[in-house]
């Protein structure tokens, strides 16, 4: 017999006023004013609305671009050093894995780990792939595309991650 577990009536009635960040990807990074009191911005001015979302690339969400000449992945890895990252190519996939052990930050101790997997286009030259992390923590994985009919060189191999000294970001669309 399944029993539905529900919040107490007062939490259901006031649901919009309770922050729910348990499954948010920003969990553990601290609370913002709008997390605690989201109704304040609308009561102060009906036309003022605090943004509930951070920029896409600041949130750890990746951006993939595939144009005529090249294939590029941009990924925010600001919490990881190049030594914490592993990038490898297997068949038609690139796997990016980041892991750092427990360390202290502003809110206590934290350890992080992520695993991303992307399908490479069949015409990407896998012998010319490169990966770097900019000074501001933006990982850029790229590879040129080859003309149709040429061998793209599919095999498993690790891609070294280099560090750039200048800040980098994804070009705007």
Curated annotation (Swiss-Prot):
InterPro entries: A-crystallin/Hsp20_dom (IPR002068), Alpha-crystallin/HSP_16 (IPR055269), Alpha-crystallin/sHSP_animal (IPR001436), Alpha-crystallin_N (IPR003090), HSP20-like_chaperone (IPR008978). Signal peptide: none annotated. Zn(2+) 3 binds at residue 154. The modification N6-acetyllysine is found at residues 70, 99. The modification Phosphoserine is found at residues 45, 122. It comes from the Eukaryota. Residues 144-173 are annotated as: Disordered. Transmembrane segments: none annotated. Residues 153-167 have a biased composition (Basic and acidic residues). Zn(2+) 2 binds at residue 107. PROSITE patterns: SHSP. Residues 52-162 form the sHSP domain. Contributes to the transparency and refractive index of the lens. Acts as a chaperone, preventing aggregation of various proteins under a wide range of stress conditions. Required for the correct formation of lens intermediate filaments as part of a complex composed of BFSP1, BFSP2 and CRYAA. This is Alpha-crystallin A chain. It comes from Equus caballus. The gene is CRYAA.
